[in-house]
Amino acid sequence: MNKIANTEVEINIFNLLKKLWKKKFLITFVAIAFATAGLFYSLFIVTPQYTSSTRIYVINPNTPNNSITAQDLQAGSFLANDYKEIITSTDVLEKVISSEKLNYPSSQLLQKITVSILKDTRVISISVEDANPKMSQKLANSVREAAVSKIKAVTQVEDITTLEKGNLPKAPSSPNIKKNVLIGFIVGAGLSTIVLVIMGILDDRVNTEEDIEKVLGLTSLGIVPDLNKL
């Protein structure tokens, strides 16, 4: 009994695959349509964003000159996480807003800033994203300067080195056009396939001679031809 049931399931899956294959051009068309929508969205709807990055290096205040150990590096890594919180603090953000005369709140500025710490180092990277490439560079440097001042005031650290100043981005960092087009293509192909599979599962019409024998349990004696096709 299980063998028969398994056979029927296999036949149903095979029939679904046959139906999908017959609709391959429709699936491709829908996928291309969604990919085109992703391209249109990337080029004409979403505003391109530019990212400028600056990096600083912070020395552990308890480390004597020229005597950095592995423990110092580990401690410095933990301190770097503290510095990360200081960089994104309201005081730093408000100072940047004041110095750059920005007309939006600190919460909006915070959304533009990404602070990352290179693994097992005390190097802190500050990235700022903005629709204007020059503004992203200006904000990155302003955030760095305000953050360095705040870190010195809070932790009594004096040795903070600027490894890199904010660069002027020449190309947008987002949107990722290739990624959006690929996502659109995959979503289009996936949705059209799912819809066709559901339609195939719900389709209980008798279409073939085999369907008649399966549903009624009777042997077919013959087929009446369609007169319109004669």
Swiss-Prot record:
Coiled coil feature spans: none
Pathway the protein contributes to: Capsule biogenesis; capsule polysaccharide biosynthesis
Main localization of the protein described in the UniProt heading: membrane
Keywords: Capsule biogenesis/degradation, Cell membrane, Exopolysaccharide synthesis, Membrane, Transmembrane, Transmembrane helix
Biological process according to GO: capsule polysaccharide biosynthetic process
MF terms in GO: protein tyrosine kinase activity
UniProt-reported outcome of changing residue 115 to I: In strain: CNTC 1/82
Membrane topology: Multi-pass membrane protein
Subcellular location: Cell membrane
GO cellular component: plasma membrane
Domain of life: Bacteria
Record field: transmembrane: 25-45, 181-201
Family: Belongs to the CpsC/CapA family.
Function, as annotated: Required for CpsD phosphorylation. Involved in the regulation of capsular polysaccharide biosynthesis. May be part of a complex that directs the coordinated polymerization and export to the cell surface of the capsular polysaccharide.
PANTHER family: FERRIC ENTEROBACTIN TRANSPORT PROTEIN FEPE (PTHR32309:SF13), TYROSINE-PROTEIN KINASE (PTHR32309)
Name of the featured protein: Capsular polysaccharide biosynthesis protein CpsC
Chain's gene name: cpsC
